[in-house]
Structure formats: C-alpha cells, structure tokens
C-alpha cells in the first residue's frame, strides 16, 4: 500500500527544541491521523554535522602549514567514517527522545515493511534539513521509502488556462550554403 507520511517541525531550533507533528495518509486520500511530539534541544548536533562535513572535505588533503605556522593535517578515510558514525549515532539518539516517542510509535504502528512510503520532511530550519535523515534507524525496516524535504509553508500555483486553439508549429529546415541570404536579412 502507498503511504504519504508528513513530518513537520513547527518552529524551534537546536537551542530550544522543535515541536513536531506527524500526518499519515494513504496516497491520494485525506489524512488518516495526526500526532504531536517534540524533539528536545540538542546543542551539539549542528556542530557534529559541521565536523563531519569538514572532516570529509579534508579527506586526502596533504599536510600543510597554515598562516599561523601550525601544521594542519588532511583527514583520513577512517576520520571521515568515525565522524559520520558519530553524527548518525547522535541523530538516532536524539530521535529516540521520550518527547518524540508518540511519533515513533505511530510510525511503527501504521507502516508495514512492505508499504511504499513517501516521507516528506517539512522543516524550515536549515540545520535540521541538512541532517542525514536517511540514516534514521527506524527507517531501516522500510525497503520502499523515499525521503523528501519541503518547506512547511507553500501556496498552490494557478494553472494557466488551456490554449483556445490548437497550437500550430512551422519549421523550415535547410542549408543556406551557396545562397546569398544577406539581402533577405537586411530587409526584415
């Protein structure tokens, strides 16, 4: 069965935490249920993300002396893997917070491993968007899941009215070699 799951953060930041809502619907149908929960403050998670990014960005760079005279070493693959594992561990620990349990429980209750799931994360906090949501351990049991980011605010786009007459296309194909077309260009 195709399911649409919308996880929305309602304001907040990593200093204060995030209020969240979860909506689940069968694809093409109205929302079946809505659950509220919260993610607590987690000051170090954005820094863990930046550390992982910086470590992997420096992957394979040679040691070099910076302007201050200190030697900076490039990161190794194992440094990058360690930073990635640490970030994933912190993310999953955060997503197991007691205040987020109602959302986790409802996901496990409503979704079956064989379901095709579209998980839409409606978040406005850039740092929250950048987290590796695909590494959420809860999602490992769903083999047919897509994760998408979306803005929590949106407006429907009006469709253009259809053309009253069918469109006609004229295409002239040819080769101008050997023909003096300069006089035609000047006249038009």
Model-found features: residue ranges?
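Non-catalytic, solvent-exposed interaction/assembly segments
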Residues: 1-167, 172
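Glycine-rich phosphate/diphosphate-binding loop of Rossmann-like nucleotide-binding domains
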Residues: 178-180
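Short helix-loop-beta junction
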Residues: 185-188
């Amino acid at each position: 069965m195709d399911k649409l799951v919308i996880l929305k953060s309602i304001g907040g930041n990593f200093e204060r935490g995030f209020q969240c809502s979860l909506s689940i619907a069968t694809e093409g149908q109205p929302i079946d249920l809505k659950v509220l929960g919260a993610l607590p403050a987690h000051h170090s998670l954005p820094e863990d993300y930046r550390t992982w990014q910086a470590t992997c960005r420096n992957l394979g760079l040679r040691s070099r002396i910076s302007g201050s005279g200190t030697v900076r070493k490039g990161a190794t693959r194992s440094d990058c893997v360690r930073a990635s594992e640490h970030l994933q561990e912190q993310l999953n620990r955060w997503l197991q917070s007691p205040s987020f349990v109602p959302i986790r429980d409802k996901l496990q209750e409503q979704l079956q491993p064989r379901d095709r799931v579209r998980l839409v994360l409606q978040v406005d906090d850039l740092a929250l968007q950048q987290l590796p949501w695909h590494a959420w351990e809860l999602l490992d049991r769903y083999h047919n899941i897509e994760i998408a980011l979306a803005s929590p605010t949106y407006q429907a786009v009006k469709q253009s009215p259809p053309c009253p007459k069918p469109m006609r296309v004229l295409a002239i194909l040819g080769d101008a070699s050997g023909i003096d077309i300069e006089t035609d260009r000047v006249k038009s």
